[in-house]
């Protein structure tokens, strides 16, 4: 049975050696946008689990949050340390396992993670552990791949041939995510989706060309003069509807303890 293991992530970050954060796609600002829409993080104690590059945690620290980042990949923590020093903010970095957090019950006002829950065949132990360290009334933000997207097909094909970078990964519909939150003792309060810009095909093409022939396409190509404004207007209109959450590549949701 395939699974996502620590060595997959160590290999991922080893491959990223020598890259700066400017070479790694961010999440388009969606995590910060949604957090600031739901709460004011100033003064809050915040934990990011599986922090990766720590970009969002660093931005939250700038906004006045008291931030802790946790990851079990040493290279990830090195990146966060370097970036937080450049930004001139204080971020606490902890090496650890998201299934066994080294914090007492009720330690945090906000816990969040992205690209994490989908790598566990049984997500409930992790969710319950994250709920454990939330204060009463605290918020958990979970950001995961959305089930009904062509990304899912390509991902499962790669997994079938043992070519998926993370070893194994699943996906969720927004309804499934909300049901998981309820089962973990949370009340879902807010959901959102993201279509990914630039799209998956462009990102894959850029990576292939860089690795094979050394061509470095721009990370964010200029939108076409006519199509760009139309596309933005469509996304703004349709993105306000719950039905859009069944078309996006990723979804996220908040649950309150």
Give the ranges of each region predicted by the language model:
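Short, glycine-/aromatic-enriched active-site segment of Class I SAM-dependent methyltransferases
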Residues: 146-168, 179
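A C-terminal cap/extension of S-adenosyl-L-methionine-dependent methyltransferases
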Residues: 190-257
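A short His-aromatic
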Residues: 115-119
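Short alpha-helix
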Residues: 169-185, 191
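Acidic carboxylate diad motif detector
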Residues: 142-144
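A short glycine-rich, Lys/Arg-flanked "PGG" loop and its adjoining helix->strand segment in the class I
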Residues: 124-139
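Short low-complexity, flexible loop/linker segments enriched in glycine and/or proline
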Residues: 82-86, 157-158, 203-207
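Conserved N-terminal segment of class I S-adenosyl-L-methionine
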Residues: 1-100, 104, 110-114, 127, ...
């Amino acid at each position: 049975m395939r699974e996502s293991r620590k060595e997959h992530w160590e290999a991922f970050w080893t491959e990223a050696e020598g890259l700066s954060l400017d070479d790694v796609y961010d999440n388009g600002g969606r995590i910060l946008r949604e957090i600031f829409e739901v709460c004011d993080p100033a003064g809050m104690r915040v934990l990011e689990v599986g922090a990766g590059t720590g970009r969002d945690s660093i931005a939250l620290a700038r906004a006045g949050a008291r931030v802790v980042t946790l990851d079990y990949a040493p290279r990830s923590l090195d990146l966060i340390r370097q970036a937080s020093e450049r930004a001139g903010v204080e971020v606490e970095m902890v090496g650890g396992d998201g299934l066994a957090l080294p914090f007492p019950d009720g330690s945090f006002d906000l816990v969040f993670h992205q690209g994490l829950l989908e790598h566990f065949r049984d997500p409930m132990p992790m969710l319950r552990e994250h709920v454990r360290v939330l204060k009463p009334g605290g918020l958990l933000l979970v950001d995961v791949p959305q089930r009904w997207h062509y990304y899912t097909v390509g991902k499962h094909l790669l997994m079938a041939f043992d070519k998926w970078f993370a070893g194994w990964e699943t996906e969720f519909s927004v309804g499934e995510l909300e049901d998981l939150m309820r089962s973990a003792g949370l009340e879902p309060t807010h959901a959102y989706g993201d279509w990914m810009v630039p799209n998956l095909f462009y990102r894959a093409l850029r990576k292939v060309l860089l690795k094979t022939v050394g061509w470095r396409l721009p990370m964010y190509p200029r939108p076409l003069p006519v199509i760009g404004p139309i596309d933005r207007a469509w996304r703004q209109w349709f993105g306000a509807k719950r039905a859009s959450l069944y078309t996006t590549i990723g979804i996220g949701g908040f649950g309150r303890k």
